[in-house]
Amino acid sequence: PALLAQNASEFNFSVGARIYNDGNQGQGNVSLRATVTNPAGNLVYDNSVSGLNISSVDSADVYPTGNFTLADFSLASYPAGTYTLTYTASLDSLDEYASDNSISYTFTISESIYSAAKIDTATGLPSGKTFYRPSTNNQTFSICSAINNPNASRLAVEGLYFAATKGIVVPEDSLMAGEEMNLTLYKWEDVFADL
């Protein structure tokens, strides 16, 4: 939520990637560019690193303590909305399959919602369209999301959203009517020692 991202000291993250060379030729002087656009579509982060040499069927890493690094993403303020982080790899030579040289991710700063799920930009609510569960789910299944933030005292829980799914081998199996759901919210009062 925006209350946890008031300025650069409260919200920032390391930027990095692993670049793969699936081709049969080594690649010299590969560069990686990372950009972030804000909710208005303006470029607010643009950094790159070059000089990566990647052998055939190998990879190279760009990360904070490695040989190749990108600056952390950090802004003076964070307007609410959806941001887009894009990584683009470039080569000095002809790339016979350039369509996999770029990948984008989005993240949302919401006015009031903390979510591990993707946020629907039209409604501002968590999107219940992607589900994760054990492949053989013959017991109860639970998931935990912990908030460890020095500014979490600014927040108060006013409600919980959840989504659920069932198998659809038989169309009627997907109906949730009559199913029991148990939502539990715990307050962790012990010291976070190793999270």
Language-model regions: role of each:
Residues 7-12, 16, 100-191:
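Beta-sheet-rich sandwich/jelly-roll-like modules and their strand-loop junctions
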Residues 32-38, 183-187:
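Conserved aromatic beta-strand anchor motif in extracellular beta-sandwich/beta-rich domains
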Residues 21-25, 40, 151, 166-168:
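Short, acidic/polar linear motifs in exposed loop/turn regions
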